[in-house]
Curated annotation (Swiss-Prot):
It is found in: Cytoplasm; Nucleus, Nucleolus. Changing L18P: In DBA1; affects protein stability; does not localize to the nucleolus; affects assembly into a functional ribosomal subunit. GO terms for molecular function: fibroblast growth factor binding; identical protein binding; protein kinase binding; RNA binding; structural constituent of ribosome. Changing A61E: In DBA1; does not localize to the nucleolus; affects assembly into a functional ribosomal subunit. It is linked to Diamond-Blackfan anemia 1: A form of Diamond-Blackfan anemia, a congenital non-regenerative hypoplastic anemia that usually presents early in infancy. Diamond-Blackfan anemia is characterized by a moderate to severe macrocytic anemia, erythroblastopenia, and an increased risk of developing leukemia. 30 to 40% of Diamond-Blackfan anemia patients present with short stature and congenital anomalies, the most frequent being craniofacial (Pierre-Robin syndrome and cleft palate), thumb and urogenital anomalies. Component of the small ribosomal subunit. Part of the small subunit (SSU) processome, composed of more than 70 proteins and the RNA chaperone small nucleolar RNA (snoRNA) U3. Interacts with RPS19BP1; the interaction is direct and mediates the integration of RPS19 in state post-A1. Interacts with RPS19BP1. It holds the Pfam family Ribosomal_S19e. Belongs to the eukaryotic ribosomal protein eS19 family. The gene is RPS19. Component of the small ribosomal subunit. The ribosome is a large ribonucleoprotein complex responsible for the synthesis of proteins in the cell. Required for pre-rRNA processing and maturation of 40S ribosomal subunits. Part of the small subunit (SSU) processome, first precursor of the small eukaryotic ribosomal subunit. Keywords: Acetylation, Cytoplasm, Diamond-Blackfan anemia, Disease variant, Host-virus interaction, Methylation, Nucleus, Ribonucleoprotein, Ribosomal protein. It comes from Homo sapiens (Human). GO terms for biological process: antimicrobial humoral immune response mediated by antimicrobial peptide; cytoplasmic translation; defense response to Gram-negative bacterium; erythrocyte differentiation; killing of cells of another organism; maturation of SSU-rRNA; maturation of SSU-rRNA from tricistronic rRNA transcript (SSU-rRNA, 5.8S rRNA, LSU-rRNA); monocyte chemotaxis. This is Small ribosomal subunit protein eS19.
Amino acid sequence: MPGVTVKDVNQQEFVRALAAFLKKSGKLKVPEWVDTVKLAKHKELAPYDENWFYTRAASTARHLYLRGGAGVGSMTKIYGGRQRNGVMPSHFSRGSKSVARRVLQALEGLKMVEKDQDGGRKLTPQGQRDLDRIAGQVAAANKKH
């Protein structure tokens, strides 16, 4: 659909569609440790979904589409959560820097993301075009229902 952007579609459906596109393309470089790692220190278990790396990459690409100039540190803030401390009060805890760095490096390998001269990463014109195309597909699929 012409004129449909990432902001116009449901974010969950978009991330699911983009993750499926990344997996189907087969070009995203996935580290070998993805099945054994936790996503943050406040998590108790590794993710149940075996395709979590594609979902995280899709979510990161969507975030960079909405707010460019985000780096590894800001991604750890976005994917942080509540650290439970037993009988002590809970506090905020950041996500894994290694996972955030590897996701951004994988997206750079696809030429969807590039380093920004002001710091952080930003979407390339090709990456923005891919995301808008997938948003159009999601909007067209929703229109049929």
